[in-house]
């Protein structure tokens, strides 16, 4: 075999042999580029940011309505307006990031220079200064905190694109995607302790530490963890995918770049699926209300979470095999439909099918808790599958953009994606606050500042409807939307082969131009 290869190579003239070597080098998908230290850094950054985002997303609305004292309508309007602003800001930040050139790379600097912005904003999100006496002052405080947090994250989230830049190997990239999504599961452990501390610490300390103080303490802790891991990631990670020069970037104007991005069909299908998938966050934002008021304790949510997340540790490592067998698109479609059916069944059977205790079953009971945990476990089975598939499909969008228009422009594609994503968030953010108002909930606290449990059946049924039906709608529409994602199957195989040829032609052209300059 080696002799045949040697004869074949000997028969080639020097130029053909050079091309053959280029092809062999370009096809070398088994080569390892990422060092172990970088894998650790990327996973730690993922861990830190997952901790922070999980904590903020799950508790911000509950804290601001229950302790800061703003209404659900005011909160929803703030999030709605901020999301519109954030969408416009992302358009600018994407262009700035795409054209950034520093000795530390294009993306890494934003991992460290944004830390003070979102770090301070996180502290503001979970504090209620005594100087805030009226509704107007409280709303202004909330506006500054929410706007500053999302502004910092608009630029910091450039680190997500590092996933597609720290290695040119598709195999390494896909493996890192699956590993990072698996590691994200660990990133929910610390935030999951919040309900336990909120429930028991005020009792243990005889009211010296109230519920509000627990949320504030966790906010500080999450900000410190996220900041430390981000700084470590900045120093440990490297960018390896070659960047286009400033001259090459200028060949395609900003307007043309936006036109190319807008005409990117798979990108828009992914945007639409993400828009519908975002409605699950409306249900997620009601979790604290549901567990406290419907079941009687926030701890119930933590107990359920200990079991509902366990299957993900098995399913996430298996997801690459599912993608290899069925394709990322088809796997995502199946996961979405499965999740929609599961959440619909959860709503049909209600959250307490077994009436226990007095007052029409207001005492939740162990049997109901076991049932709810089992149902939520089934509902959560496709979660990690969807997250892995989304990351893989995002890589397909970048590849399609390079194949179709000749320029990868990841930051620009991410900009357009984020633009529409933030517009979608404005809708779901508005719904999150408005839905709480629609069900008729008004927060009440006792003398120690702790939230008093709601008992009105109409309000409790409203909480559960948001909790179950919004995720059901989100999962169904997510799966259905991806039917129109065209980068899959034979088309994807042919596209990647053609893209490899185009890359080789680009390399040969650059080498030829370099040789001409050397001769002259």
Where are each of the predicted segments found?
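Soluble N-terminal domains of membrane-associated systems
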Residues: 1-3
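Membrane-embedded alpha-helical bundles of multi-pass transporters/translocases
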Residues: 5-519
